[in-house]
């Protein structure tokens, strides 16, 4: 599963790494 930058809950459901998804979300969200 890839991190969805459009969904804030993506970082919670990302098994690859919460930090990675969180960063992706933060970048997508100014």
UniProtKB/Swiss-Prot annotation:
Expressed by the venom gland. One of its GO terms (biological process) is killing of cells of another organism. InterPro entries: Cytotoxin_Cobra (IPR003572), Snake_toxin-like_sf (IPR045860). SUPFAM superfamilies: Snake toxin-like. It is found in: Secreted; Target cell membrane. One of its GO terms (cellular component) is other organism cell membrane. Gene3D superfamilies: CD59. One of its GO terms (molecular function) is toxin activity. Disulfide bonds join 3-21. Keywords: Cardiotoxin, Cytolysis, Disulfide bond, Membrane, Secreted, Target cell membrane, Target membrane, Toxin. It comes from the Eukaryota. The keyword Membrane applies. Shows cytolytic activity on many different cells by forming pore in lipid membranes. In vivo, increases heart rate or kills the animal by cardiac arrest. In addition, it binds to heparin with high affinity, interacts with Kv channel-interacting protein 1 (KCNIP1) in a calcium-independent manner, and binds to integrin alpha-V/beta-3 (ITGAV/ITGB3) with moderate affinity. Belongs to the three-finger toxin family. Short-chain subfamily. Type IA cytotoxin sub-subfamily. Monomer in solution; Homodimer and oligomer in the presence of negatively charged lipids forming a pore with a size ranging between 20 and 30 Angstroms. This is Cytotoxin 3a. It comes from Naja naja.
